[in-house]
Structures are given as C-alpha cells and as structure tokens.
Amino acid sequence: MKIDMEFKGLEELVKAFESAASDEDIAQVNKTIAEKGEPVVQRIMSGKIPKSKDIKKSGRGFGSKSSVSAHAADEIPIGKVKVNGTGATADVGWEKNTQDEGGHFYVRFINWGTIYRPPQEFIYATGREADAELQKIAEQEYQAYLD
C-alpha cells in the first residue's frame, strides 16, 4: 500500500526553499525529512495494529506448527529511503509480496478485513494521524536550510 503525503500550508516556505537551493540540496533535505518521518509513522502505526493477549494464538493457526515470535505491531519494518530526482520516498510497513517472509502475512487481513471479520483499517488512519508531525518535520528542515 502506498500513501502519498502532500504538505499544505507550507507553499511559501517551499517556494523560497526551492528557489534558494540546488537540486542536490533539495534532494538531501527531502531525504532527511523522509528519514526523520519513518520512526514517527512506525510509532503511530504500531499503536493502531491490534495485538492478541496471547502471542501463541497469533499467526497462521489451523493446526499449523508455525507461529510468530512477536506481534506485527512490534515488528513494523522500515525500508531504506529512496531518492528520485529531488523527491524522496520512505517505506514503512510490509511489502505486498514479502509479508510471508516476516511471518506477518495475515496483517493485510486486519487492515482490509475478510468475509468473516470487518476491516480494522490502520494504514490510512496512520497517514492521517502522522500528517501533522510530518508537516512539522518538513517545516523545520526547510527553515533550517534557509537560516
């Protein structure tokens, strides 16, 4: 799942920053913003993923001997920040095709639900809640460059 974040209310600051900075500086500052934002998103997301009271009952089930060693909320992966041009992207959470490897394949069913369980949507809720903190990080980094 991918969520695009746009910083609103910072238009004037971003324009001043973009006119004063080179493309390399813009890319570096945006990378710093993404790096500082990853733990914020991870912290918020971990509070939104439900945890079972007994970890032994988590995971595949159905008589399977494989079980997870920790709750998904405690093992949210953070990817490496990628810079593309002057923009930067950060991955927080599981890749769609690699959830099996981390033992948290079923976390997708928590978010989107099944025919038996209603969705407990946490991905978009995390993005909405993290928005203010990410805006503050971006504002601080842009202002620090201009000062």
Tell where the protein language model's regions lie, with residue ranges.
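Short, Lys/Arg-rich flexible segments
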Residues: 1-90, 96-147
